[in-house]
């Protein structure tokens, strides 16, 4: 790769030229089963005809005008997202970090309007919300923050899935205005929240007048088998953030607001040059259409359950395996030791995965994954894991 590139990525030694469905081909025409989907972004896989057509047609007509003007594609996508989520309004951006940054700003402005000039937000340990300074401060990872201090203040981190800890944090700090959490922690090791915990947090936020802000950047847009992972708990947040799969690979982010969070921002309180442009929103509309027309929510749920069960069965009783967990097509396999080398070994075997939290194999395949392709993942990955663990004894 070019020496002119900033040295911030530990890249695997492969370059891809094209893709089709769940498959990618490298410069040597070798084929790989993509079980990572660009870290959960390529939800329709590669070369999806509907998405390609929508992007091509929109690019030929108009790519960018800015938010100085009306953007019909933006308005249409906002309506679709509001219908699917039950939320009231949508603010578009370009990434998950930007969407979460907007949510943090909204929570602070919400507090400010109530006379709270130093609003605090409760966040979870092992969480991940982005790489801007505010989202890093919200993220539950000291390693990610190292060297970038001083961090913005106003964040209180508590253990995940611990409702009493959230309640205690609110009692200790009267300036709390919001709780920010992931329903299913992605970078945190595919850690699911308890449904009772989510319902309890919803009730607590309502009682205290706090905003419940849910980060669905990785778990949203059908990945768990529902449009948004919090829908499994039958709750609605006040703020929700989206990105990754929303436009199938075209950069986009979104912050949705409802209830007390709706109408907090006014003209001039936030903004973006590129966010919600015609191209990205046309892609987002195509993604939603494809998920609906091709039954991909049901597919993610059913094929994900099949893959989960197959992995759990094949790895049951294997020394060194802690747990197979997740929901839909957002799955993790936790080992009892660092296993980053498995990403390289899987790539060498024709399978694309990654490892998070040093010892959790993460699977985020496209929502179009078939049962047969799920079985191929199992056939490649399970022997690699068993071999790795046997060598480490």
Swiss-Prot record:
Any one GO CC term of the record: cytoplasm
Residues holding N(2)-acetyl-L-ornithine: 131, 272
Coiled-coil regions listed in the entry: none
Post-translational modification N6-(pyridoxal phosphate)lysine, affected residues: 244
GO annotation (BP), single: L-arginine biosynthetic process
Presence of keyword Transferase: yes
Binding site for pyridoxal 5'-phosphate: 215-218, 273
EC code: 2.6.1.11
GO molecular function, one term: identical protein binding
Gene: argD1
Listed cofactors: pyridoxal 5'-phosphate
Subcellular location: Cytoplasm
Annotated TM spans: none
Catalytic activity line of the entry: N(2)-acetyl-L-ornithine + 2-oxoglutarate = N-acetyl-L-glutamate 5-semialdehyde + L-glutamate
Pathway: Amino-acid biosynthesis; L-arginine biosynthesis; N(2)-acetyl-L-ornithine from L-glutamate: step 4/4
Quaternary structure note: Homodimer.
Record family assignment: Belongs to the class-III pyridoxal-phosphate-dependent aminotransferase family. ArgD subfamily.
Additional notes on this entry: May also have succinyldiaminopimelate aminotransferase activity, thus carrying out the corresponding step in lysine biosynthesis.
Signal peptide positions (record): none
Cofactor note: Binds 1 pyridoxal phosphate per subunit.
This protein's UniProt keywords: Amino-acid biosynthesis, Aminotransferase, Arginine biosynthesis, Cytoplasm, Pyridoxal phosphate, Transferase
Name of protein: Acetylornithine aminotransferase 1
Keyword Cytoplasm set for record: yes
């Amino acid at each position: 790769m070019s020496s002119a590139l900033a040295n911030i990525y530990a890249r695997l030694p492969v370059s891809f030229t094209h893709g089709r469905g769940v498959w990618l081909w490298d410069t040597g025409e070798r084929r790989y089963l993509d079980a990572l989907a660009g870290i959960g972004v390529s939800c329709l896989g590669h070369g999806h005809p509907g998405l390609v057509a929508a992007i091509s047609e929109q690019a030929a007509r108009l790519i960018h005008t800015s938010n100085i003007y009306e953007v019909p594609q933006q308005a249409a996508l906002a309506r679709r997202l509001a219908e699917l989520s039950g939320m009231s309004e949508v603010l578009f951006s370009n990434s998950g970090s930007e969407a979460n940054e907007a949510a943090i700003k909204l929570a602070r402005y919400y507090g400010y309007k109530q006379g709270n000039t130093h609003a605090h937000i409760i966040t979870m340990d092992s969480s991940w919300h982005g790489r801007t300074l505010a989202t890093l401060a919200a993220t539950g990872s000291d390693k990610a923050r190292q060297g970038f201090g001083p961090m913005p203040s106003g964040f209180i981190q508590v253990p995940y899935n611990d409702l009493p800890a959230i309640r205690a944090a609110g009692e200790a700090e009267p300036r709390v205005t919001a709780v920010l959490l992931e329903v299913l922690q992605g970078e945190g090791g595919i850690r699911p929240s308890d449904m009772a915990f989510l319902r309890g947090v919803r009730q607590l936020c309502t009682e205290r007048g706090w905003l419940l802000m849910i980060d669905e950047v990785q778990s949203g847009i059908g990945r768990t088998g529902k449009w948004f992972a919090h829908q499994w708990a039958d709750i609605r947040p006040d703020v929700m953030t989206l990105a990754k799969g929303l436009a199938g690979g075209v950069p986009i982010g979104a912050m949705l607001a409802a209830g007390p969070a709706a109408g907090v921002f006014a003209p001039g309180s936030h903004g973006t040059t590129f966010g919600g442009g015609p191209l990205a929103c046309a892609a987002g509309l195509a993604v939603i259409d494809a998920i609906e027309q091709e039954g991909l929510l049901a597919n993610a749920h059913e094929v994900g359950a099949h893959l989960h069960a197959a992995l759990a069965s094949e790895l049951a009783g294997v020394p060194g395996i802690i747990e197979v967990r997740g929901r839909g097509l957002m799955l993790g396999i936790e080992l009892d030791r660092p296993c980053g080398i498995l990403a390289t070994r899987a790539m060498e075997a024709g399978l694309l995965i990654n490892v998070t939290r040093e010892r959790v194999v993460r699977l985020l395949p496209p929502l179009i994954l078939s049962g047969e392709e799920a079985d191929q993942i199992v056939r490649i990955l399970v022997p690699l894991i068993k071999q790795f663990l046997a060598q480490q004894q």
